[in-house]
């Protein structure tokens, strides 16, 4: 097997860096940007710190056994002398350096690379596609939220020698960002899940969001395929240049279409024609958006030559990433943890999942949606419409922006609505109102810290604390 690890000398060459100290280990097989997660023998990538703590982070990484660090900072002599057995490399631009290294690493692999973007559903689509690909390939996939100008290069730099397929998630909130990522990852298959309203305040319009997402084509390999959601109004007739377009959907005629859909308490089932034969698909999550995600995975599976029975198995057994539409049954409650991010489209999808759950009352705890700019008030009101439409029994909102969700829901007939400024206030109200067998949705942007509410609901003494 060809050695795909990067040497210290190659890092210095590619990054046009300066070797301040040469360590005893000259080959790097893992890169890390977080001192809390660093392992012995990792190369620490020292990113700029808002608090100016780069040197402290370098010391911490080296203390934990990192084989070296790459940094823009002047490293004090005392650190260099103390860690003479480590590789310390100084570069002019840390972001540019890791991106150049990732481009170099990517060229070592002649494998299927699936790049995924879209306004919502990127992570769950990534998870289900990766699980389908695992039925045939040894797969690397984006972990956590490593989907930006730092995360994508680090993801590629950490590809193991033995992988033969990869799934790379690409996020953005400005024009030009996907262009950079796709030219690093050089996908063979591009996926666009949908064009919604996430980051519309920064991009100005859905047309600009579409333009930003279509940048994914700029790095797509010659002969590559683009897979799109044909039920999305913005994607239906989009220009995919010279690339073959493969479509999936439920409503509009597509290459891969779901029909005879059945929604159950803990899964969805549907039928689909593959290779002129009718097949039954079981998706281990509820909600229409998961049906779309699975259709996308089928398209990827077929494009990469995976057998039908293996595709079906990959969909049936996939697991969702924590905090993203993660359903837990605990303390005689059903809790949907979906508080990594929030947009109108993802709120709408989550409320649909809540509506279809079997249980006692349906309780939605919703927080502010961010980065919506001038569209914020209207889109929060539209979420309020969805609350009323889905007949949610109890609505709790937290934050100034989400007051518009509450107002619209009340206006349209939702009877029990509470508005709060803090998570603590909300928890105190939940102590009063929740009952056994209730279904509770927690949905907000990550910075709203809804993990506090989730932890309370999952606490060992929950019912003893009830007022």
Give the location of each predicted region.
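Beta-strand->loop->alpha-helix junctions that form or flank phosphate-binding loops
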Residues: 69-73, 92, 242-265, 282-288, ...
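Short beta-strands and strand-loop turn motifs
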Residues: 111-114, 191-197, 229, 294, ...
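Short glycine/threonine-rich catalytic loop with a Thr-x-Gly-x-Asp
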Residues: 32-33, 265-268, 285-296, 322-325, ...
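Short secondary-structure boundary segments
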Residues: 72-74, 194, 230, 399, ...
């Amino acid at each position: 097997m060809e050695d795909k690890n990067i040497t210290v000398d190659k890092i210095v060459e590619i990054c046009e860096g300066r070797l301040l100290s040469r360590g005893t280990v000259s080959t790097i097989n893992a890169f890390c940007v977080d001192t809390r997660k660093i392992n012995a023998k990792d190369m620490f990538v020292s990113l700029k710190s808002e608090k100016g703590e780069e040197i402290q982070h370098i010391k911490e990484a080296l203390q934990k056994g990192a084989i070296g660090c790459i940094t823009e900072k002047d490293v004090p002599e005392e650190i260099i002398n103390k860690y003479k057995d480590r590789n310390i490399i100084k570069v002019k631009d840390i972001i540019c350096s890791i991106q150049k290294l990732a481009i170099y690493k990517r060229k070592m692999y002649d494998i299927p690379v699936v790049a995924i973007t879209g306004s919502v559903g990127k992570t769950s689509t990534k998870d289900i596609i990766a699980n389908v690909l695992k039925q045939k390939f040894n797969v690397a996939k984006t972990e956590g939220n490593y989907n930006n100008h730092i995360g994508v290069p680090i993801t590629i730099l950490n590809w193991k020698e033995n992988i033969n397929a990869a799934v790379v998630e690409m996020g953005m909130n400005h024009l030009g960002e996907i262009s950079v990522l796709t030219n690093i990852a050089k996908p063979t298959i591009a996926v666009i899940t949908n064009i919604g309203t996430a980051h519309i305040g920064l991009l100005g319009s859905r047309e600009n969001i579409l333009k930003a997402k279509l940048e994914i084509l700029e790095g797509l390999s010659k002969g590559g395929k683009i897979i799109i959601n044909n039920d999305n109004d913005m994607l239906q007739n989009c220009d995919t240049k010279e690339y073959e377009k493969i479509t999936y959907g439920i409503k509009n005629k597509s290459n891969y279409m779901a029909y005879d859909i059945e929604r159950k308490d803990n899964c969805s089932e549907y039928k689909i024609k593959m290779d002129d034969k009718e097949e039954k698909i079981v998706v281990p999550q509820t909600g229409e958006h998961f049906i779309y995600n699975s259709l996308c995975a089928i398209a990827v599976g077929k494009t990469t030559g995976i057998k039908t029975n293996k595709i079906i198995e990959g969909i049936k057994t996939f697991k969702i990433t924590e905090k993203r539409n993660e359903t837990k049954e605990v303390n005689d409650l059903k809790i949907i943890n979906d508080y990594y991010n929030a947009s109108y489209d993802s709120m709408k999808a989550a409320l649909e999942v809540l509506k279809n759950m079997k249980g006692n009352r349906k309780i939605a705890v919703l927080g502010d949606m961010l980065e919506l700019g001038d569209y914020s008030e209207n889109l929060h009101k539209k979420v309020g419409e969805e609350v009323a439409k889905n007949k949610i029994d109890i609505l709790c909102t937290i934050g100034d922006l989400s007051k518009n969700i509450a107002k619209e829901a009340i206006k349209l007939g939702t009877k029990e609505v509470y508005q709060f400024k803090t998570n603590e206030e909300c928890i105190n109200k939940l102590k009063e109102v929740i009952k056994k067998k209730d279904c509770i949705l927690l949905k907000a942007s990550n910075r709203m810290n809804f993990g506090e509410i989730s932890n309370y609901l999952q606490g060992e003494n929950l019912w003893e604390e009830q007022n």
